[in-house]
Structure formats: C-alpha cells, structure tokens
Amino acid sequence: MTSNEIPVHIALGSNLGNPENFLEKARETLRKLPLEKMKCSSILKSSPLLGMAQPDYLNQLVCGITLLKAEELLMECQAIEKRLGRIREQRWGPRTIDIDIISYGQQTIDSSSLKIPHPEMEKRAFVLMPLQEISPQWTHPVSGHRIEKLLEDWKSKSSEPLPVILSP
C-alpha cells in the first residue's frame, strides 16, 4: 500500500422500500469509485435508534482501500445517497440509504462536514459487529482500543438488543 492509499470503513443502512436492494445498489456504486479490495460484511437487521416508530434497518459495513481524500469520499457517498432517493427530513428518521464513513485510515478529522472516526460508532452494535467481522484487528485511532473491546464494552453497557445477522 502506498502513502496515498487509505484503508476506509463505510457503514450502509436502509429501512425504506426494499432495503436489501438499496444496500446492493450502494455497494455496486461504491465499487465504481476508487475503492480497491472492497470487502463486505454480513447483512444485519437492527431496531431503529431510540426506539423510534419506523421499520427495522438492514445494515452492512464495507471496507476497502481508496485514493480519495476524506472530503472527496464524503461527497461521493452523499451523491450516492441522493441518487438512491435519500431525503434528509428527520435526524435518525427512516431512509432509503444511509452511507457513513466510519474510519479513514488511522486519521482523526473534525470538520463541520465530517467527523472521523464516526463519533457515534461506539454506541452502535450494527457498526461494531460487522467491523469486527471484516477487520478484527482494527484499532480506534483515538482510544487505541481494538474493535473486540469496543464491542464488549457496548454489550456490557447497552440495553438494546444485538442486531440479527441475516446473511453471511
């Protein structure tokens, strides 16, 4: 890997229309980006955040190596969301597709448009479980904790049910 090649983790989520189809379309579109060696986690089914009255989500994590700068990757992810019908009406509301950059190498970014690592990742089993599945050696760039510990901590603190793995 060259110094311009950055390992990234991207979370996908959908709970409107045909969520499995939206995840597939998002993966297909991500494959067209400068995102090499792309791997996909299992698909998980999770309850909406904060017990909101909306359909359950399907979630998945993808990882790969990119040459894009973090802001460029964010713009590409937002363009994919828009093409797939994402409408931003309500925070944590239902959506056709949600695409979040979880990590960008071991970098930390805190800009008005992008926060990396994703600031809510440690509270979300639907991110932690697939991250452990496809990158079991991953280490949080701020805390230094491995993904295994982050997931153990979530399990010990959260009263939310674990997401259900739908497909390997």
Annotated model-derived regions:
Residues M1-I6, V164-P168:
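Short, low-complexity, intrinsically disordered N-terminal peptides in bacterial proteins
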Residues T2-R27:
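Extended accessory regions or peripheral subdomains of proteins
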Residues A11, C63-I65, Y104:
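Short hydrophobic/aromatic beta-strand micro-patches
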Residues L12-S14, T66, Q132:
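Short, structured patches in soluble enzyme cores that scaffold and shape functional sites
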Residues N15, C40, P130:
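Residue-level signal for inorganic ion chemistry
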Residues K25-K69:
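Short, surface-exposed acidic-centric catalytic microdomains
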Residues P48-Y57, L68-P168:
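Flexible, gly/pro- and Lys/Arg-enriched active-site loops
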